[in-house]
């Protein structure tokens, strides 16, 4: 509502504030309050199920190198490698990186092929708070292998720990 509209209705400043306050209270009573923009481990598992198309996840082959404690979550170094011969019949097709408690659980997806030589990468990721990082690798035979690593964040990506 603009100032001109308020003046047309002959409302005082006090009445406008009262109506606005009543609106906020009504919204709060009906559950229309802002929620924390954070994913849950349940949402990360749901996203992982989408990425794997419901396939069974097997432990092994995937190695995550991640600091146990990072001072700044906005640029956490992560190294991922997948043990694969990378031949025409046995290679890594894709690697997906997820963070259980980031606003958007899926951090990155990388594609590989037999000519990649190695299924390995190093990058920096944003970690909102202390949480578990999940890496899933899709193999050429359609199977999925995964690993998890815990990272404690002293100061998160948003400036909070």
Regions found by a protein language model. Give the residues of each.
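Short edge beta-strand/loop segments characteristic of extracellular beta-sandwich folds
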Residues: 77-85
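Twin-arginine (Tat) signal peptide motif
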Residues: 8-17, 35
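N-terminal secretory signal peptides
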Residues: 1-12, 22-25
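An anionic, turn-rich surface loop/hairpin at beta-sheet edges
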Residues: 103-126
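C-terminal segment of N-terminal export signals and the immediately downstream linker at the start
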Residues: 30-63
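Short acidic/polar inter-strand loop motif in beta-rich domains
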Residues: 140-146
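Extracellular Ig-like/FN3 beta-sandwich strand-entry sites
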Residues: 128-132
């Amino acid at each position: 509502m603009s100032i001109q509209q308020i003046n047309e209705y002959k409302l005082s400043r006090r009445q406008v504030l009262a109506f606005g306050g009543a609106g906020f209270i009504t919204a709060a009573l009906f559950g229309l309050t802002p929620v924390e923009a954070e994913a849950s481990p349940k949402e990360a598992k749901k996203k992982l199920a989408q990425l794997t198309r419901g396939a069974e996840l097997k432990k092994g082959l995937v190695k995550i190198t991640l600091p146990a404690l990072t001072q700044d979550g906005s640029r956490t170094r992560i190294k991922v490698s997948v043990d694969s011969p990378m031949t025409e019949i046995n290679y890594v097709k894709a690697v997906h990186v997820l963070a259980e408690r980031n606003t958007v659980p899926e951090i990155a997806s990388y594609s590989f092929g037999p000519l990649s030589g190695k299924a390995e990468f190093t990058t920096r990721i944003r970690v909102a708070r202390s949480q578990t990082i999940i890496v899933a690798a899709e193999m050429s035979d359609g199977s999925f292998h995964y690993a998890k690593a815990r990272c404690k964040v002293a100061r998160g990506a948003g400036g909070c720990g």
